[in-house]
Curated annotation (Swiss-Prot):
Species of provenance: Ruegeria sp. (strain TM1040)
UniProt GO molecular function: translation elongation factor activity
NCBIfam families: tsf
Protein name: Elongation factor Ts
Main subcellular localisation: cytoplasm
Chain spans, region Involved in Mg(2+) ion dislocation from EF-Tu: 79-82
Gene Ontology CC: cytoplasm
Chain's role: Associates with the EF-Tu.GDP complex and induces the exchange of GDP to GTP. It remains bound to the aminoacyl-tRNA.EF-Tu.GTP complex up to the GTP hydrolysis stage on the ribosome.
Length: 291
């Protein structure tokens, strides 16, 4: 696979690696960005552990809470201009309310919205506004108390990041603080038991490779891996993370002080995981010249 300057730039920005190191990592891994990040980490050349994911899709996430039940819905548009459109926002708000009564995004597409299905409403709005729109996903959360938070809100209850937190005990104040923490830190799971085993094993293999590169004795390597995996779990799981409001406490400890237990959460970000192809300027000009 041909390694482009844009690929090298993206890898450098996501890891802090030097230009030649980034290029070598991509060559060694046939252009696979995630594998290149892991390769750099193994060699001790990546200053940042997080992998960058391009999230160029636009739209809105809307959150609605009704008693002990909450829902987050993502509706995508082609441009941010449409996401700021009042008609689009009203439609998204209606879709989110309809989502409270269904369990899957497929059911939501067929749900009633003002006498039409959600799918038909979307089709009509595409014709009216003149831009493609998609109902991408929905997620539901239930608990004794469910609290919502929207980061970078476009209007009430919708924005670029929507968070729902389920609590047992406590009050809305601690729930709102935890929700803001989730929006900012983006934990992978609630607790160690909830972490995807595949993600844990992949990280373990990376740490094994890093430790063995040190050339230290096996017993020392084992302790290094154990310590680094504990750190990985603490940084990846909500309950074990340092609370952004008070870093002296974990989220679990802060909630406990407020008389609450966090039982679940959902975080939905617009465009998360979607990659949009980008042409460089020369390619755009060439395509335009061809008519």
């Amino acid at each position: 696979m041909a390694i482009t300057a844009a690929m090298v730039k993206e890898l450098r920005e996501s890891t802090g690696a030097g230009m030649m190191d980034a290029k070598k990592a991509l060559v060694e891994n046939d252009g696979d960005m995630e594998a290149a990040v892991d390769w750099l980490r193994t060699k001790g050349l990546a200053k940042a552990a997080k992998k960058s994911g391009r999230t160029a899709a636009e739209g809105l996430v809307a959150v609605v809470v009704d008693g002990g039940k909450g829902v987050a819905v993502e509706v995508n548009s082609e441009t941010d201009f449409v996401a700021k459109n009042g008609e689009f926002q009203t439609m998204v708000a209606g879709i989110a309310k309809a989502a409270l009564s269904v369990n899957t995004v497929e059911e939501l597409a067929e749900a009633d919205l003002g006498g039409k299905t959600v799918a038909t409403t979307l089709t009509d709005k595409i014709a009216t506004i003149g831009e493609n729109m998609t109902l991408r996903r929905m997620a539901k959360l239930e608990g004794e108390t469910v609290v919502s938070y929207v980061h970078n809100a476009a209007t009430d209850g919708m924005g670029k990041i929507g968070v729902l937190v389920a609590l047992s005990g406590g009050d809305e104040a601690i729930g709102k603080q935890v929700a803001m923490h989730i929006a900012a830190v983006n934990p992978a799971a609630l607790s160690e038991a909830d972490l995807d085993p595949a993600i844990v094993e992949k990280e373990r293999q990376v740490q094994i490779d890093i430790a063995r590169e040190s050339g230290k004795p096996e017993q020392v390597i084992e302790k290094m891996i154990e310590g680094r995996m504990k750190k990985f779990v603490a940084e990846s799981t909500l309950l074990n993370q340092q609370f952004v409001v008070n870093p002296d406490l974990t989220v679990e400890a802060a909630a406990k002080e407020a008389g609450a237990t966090v039982t679940g959460f959902i975080r939905v970000e617009v465009g998360e995981g979607i990659e949009v192809e980008k042409e460089d300027f020369a390619a755009e000009v060439a395509k335009a010249a061809q008519g």
